[in-house]
Amino acid sequence: MCSISGIIVKDNQISAKYSIDMMKILKHRGRDNSGLLLDDEVIYFNDFEDVEDLEEEMIGNLSLAHNRLAIVGRYGVQPIPNEDETIWLVCNGEIYNYIELREYLKQNHEFRTDSDNEVIIHLYEEEKLEELDGDYAFAIYDKSKNVVRLARDMFGVKPLFYVDRDKYFAFASERKALWHLLINIDGCERDLDELNSKIKTLKPNSQLIYYLDDNRFEIIEGFKKLELNYMKERSYEEAKEYLDRALKNSVLKRVRGLDKVGIICSGGVDSSLIAKLASLYCEVILYAVGTENSEDLIYAERLAKDLNLKLRKKIISEEEYEEYVFKVAKAIDEVDLMKIGVGIPIYVASEMANEDGLKVVLSGQGADELFGGYARHERIYRERGEEELKKELLKDVYNLYKVNLERDDHCTMANGVELRVPFLDEEVVEIALSIPIEYKMSELSNRPYAESNISLKSEPINGLKNTNLNIKCVRSVRKKILRDVASQYLPDYIAYRPKKAAQYGSGGEKMIYKVAKKYGFSKKRINEFLDMLKRKIVSEF
């Protein structure tokens, strides 16, 4: 959607060059226009060449900066002030209930823009930030109170990082912008692990309040509360109806105002359900990525045909995979084998979406954590019981930001495309986490499941709709209630397809080892290959 960044200098003033350099580093996140507040002076511009002469001339103690990817509103350039310019905002994100909030707030406030983000300023003035429904990371500078307030959405869909050093405090949407300060102000070595060790993540559902008078800050966690008794004593059919309705509402909120949206589609139940629901409200394009003969491509292709949805697919060659390994590592600001393997299909899908002129894609991220989709969830349920699995799912949801969401955001935004995740809507999460465990994990017999080695040339199988896929019967199923909701919209070969990790379904795991081997590193020496990647990332920075 956008990038935000800012610097608070603790003693002497600093030139605008550092803030503008950070904006340049984050430009891929928002190419439509940019804005910078430096103390009391504000500049808006479309091209960094327009501000070259100001980089050294402008100095100050505090900056807020923004690069915009315009999605909602034509006149949403930031930083945005309140009516008397005593409060300034920069925000990365989308506010899904902004129309309703705007209607309420305009009774006492004057709006300057048609941006969804502007409601944040006036909610802050009304002390009602908890009414926000959206995915966001923002910074507010309140001159009257002499504070800067950072905040992040409930589940951390939008990233926000910060550093606190002797000379300055700074924040940014991506760590690479903070590397620039650590290297050029603090003189830190170009060592990826060392640089990242100095950077902290603002946790989801948290606010950081920086007091400018004495250069200190405090963090307030859990400023919004989840209602986890939502589905208490509901029958299975009632729970299905609630979940179905909430998912449709969530998808509708995330495509409102869009004529066309992309879906990062693996051919699994999660992304396929989101695709089908989105197609009820706007045009949908599926983006599927994998290596030659990867399962995800085969399933996605069949799904697109059966549901009459447009599909763009990309088969990644070994040579291309090498290129994407480096691109993804650079995008996510870290070197982690699993994150790179999962990130490559996301990166390539968003690259294709950008080529098609799309600014928004949806994914099925979060469903496994909410409904018990991993093998370890079933194992915990069998061995340790329902209460332990409840705790595990809750922990997984709150850890999504560092395990998956920051990676996914960086991979899509590297291509100027915003990712939205309907499963992490607050109402959907409240319903999912309060659904009884036995509705998610159950003993079944004779339930059709698509096999891994599918054959599209085989004869149709009785009992499966719209498919020629081979099936087998299994005794247990994870994500039962979600699969049963999905079966109302999708062929059974998708609704009941077994879980397969993205890096395996796309064929990427094996390909990464091939890339490492090309550089002289065997599978046993994969960590040496990763170390080489780390050096390459920071050397090119």
UniProtKB/Swiss-Prot annotation:
Cite a single GO MF annotation: asparagine synthase (glutamine-hydrolyzing) activity
Transmembrane residues, as ranges?
none
Catalyzed reactions per annotation? L-aspartate + L-glutamine + ATP + H2O = L-asparagine + L-glutamate + AMP + diphosphate + H(+)
The record, for InterPro entries, names: Asn_synth_AEB, Asn_synthase, Asn_Synthetase, AsnB_N, GATase_2_dom, Ntn_hydrolases_N, Rossmann-like_a/b/a_fold
Positions of the Glutamine amidotransferase type-2 domain: 2-213
Q: Which GO terms describe its cellular component?
A: cytosol
The pathway to which it is assigned is: Amino-acid biosynthesis; L-asparagine biosynthesis; L-asparagine from L-aspartate (L-Gln route): step 1/1
Identify which top EC class this enzyme belongs to: ligase
GO biological process terms, alphabetically, are: asparagine biosynthetic process; L-asparagine biosynthetic process
Similarity-based family:
Belongs to the asparagine synthetase family.
Task: Provide the protein name.
Answer: Putative asparagine synthetase [glutamine-hydrolyzing] 1
